[in-house]
């Protein structure tokens, strides 16, 4: 049986634990309310305290990450760095890579246009692409070399002009129609080759294609333009990269 002094200490410790639990819960709600008041279009997915710091990592439903004080009065948009024995470690980049890696693992090859590696597969890269993008075409010309090096290229659709061409959402953009026509073709690889080489493809929109889902996924990944290469690790490599340089980055 605890003596009165020990009972008092235990009670005090329990009260402190309850206080901090409530404080952490209320911090997330406080941050959510602050976001809603300042920018209603910014919706909080979750808020997690940065280990040992009076700072919260705020993940939005869009996939973007902010940092906030517990009272929700100050927000920082950008990367958070941790100074340690490794130098300056980009905490935000690591967090984003981890999120993208989980999403990449859930992708289905049947929903993409896949150019399989020749011989032993040494790596897989996922590329958000648009038919009307000059650097996307330049990267596509590197695909045979990438395949020779043992790298499988999996294309996801990212129409830079968006899906709809009008406010009433009744007309599709040209880039959307071209990409969907590739996905609806019986031979997606040949259709992609033709579209990349000429910029033209016979219109075929009579199928269920994941174009809009890919566009949404790209936004969650932080894609801001095309091409955008996502490695198996979740790392995002924006823009064009020559085949041999990409292989070197992959350790091949």
Question: How would you name each of these model-derived features?
Answer:
Residues 105-123:
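A short beta-strand-turn-helix
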Residues 28, 32, 140-143, 176-179, ...:
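Extracytoplasmic/secreted envelope proteins and their assembly/folding machinery
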Residues 41-48, 54-60, 64-67, 71-88, ...:
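Thiol/selenol-based redox catalytic cores and closely related redox-interacting motifs
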Residues 1-9:
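Bacterial N-terminal signal peptides that target proteins for export
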Residues 93-96:
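Extended, non-globular interaction scaffolds
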Residues 121-206, 219-224, 252:
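Structural alpha/beta surface segment adjacent to cysteine/selenocysteine redox centers
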Residues 23-43:
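Short, non-transmembrane alpha-helical segments in secretory-pathway proteins
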Residues 9-18:
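Bacterial N-terminal signal peptides
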């Amino acid at each position: 049986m605890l003596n009165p002094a020990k009972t008092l200490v235990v009670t005090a410790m329990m009260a402190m634990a309850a206080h901090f639990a409530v404080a952490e819960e209320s911090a997330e709600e406080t941050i959510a309310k602050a976001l809603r008041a300042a920018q209603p279009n910014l919706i909080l997915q979750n808020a997690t305290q940065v280990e040992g710091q009076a700072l919260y990592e705020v993940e939005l439903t869009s996939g973007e990450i902010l940092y906030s004080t517990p009272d929700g009065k100050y927000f920082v948009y950008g990367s958070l760095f941790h100074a340690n024995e490794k130098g300056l470690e980009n905490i935000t980049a690591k967090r984003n890579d981890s999120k993208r890696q989980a999403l990449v693992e859930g992708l289905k090859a049947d929903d993409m246009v896949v150019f399989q590696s020749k011989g032993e597969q040494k790596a897989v890269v996922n590329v958000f692409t648009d038919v009307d993008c000059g650097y996307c075409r330049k990267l596509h010309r590197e695909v045979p070399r990438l395949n020779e090096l043992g790298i499988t290229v999996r294309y996801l659709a990212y129409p830079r002009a968006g899906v709809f061409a009008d406010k009433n959402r009744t007309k599709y953009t040209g880039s959307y129609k071209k990409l969907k026509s590739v996905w609806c073709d019986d031979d997606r690889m040949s259709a992609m080759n033709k579209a990349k080489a000429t910029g033209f493809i016979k219109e075929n929109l009579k199928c269920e294609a994941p174009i809009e889902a890919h566009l949404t996924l790209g936004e969650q990944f932080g894609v801001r333009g095309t091409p955008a290469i996502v490695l198996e690790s979740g790392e995002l490599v924006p823009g064009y990269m020559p085949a041999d340089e990409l292989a070197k980055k992959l350790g091949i």
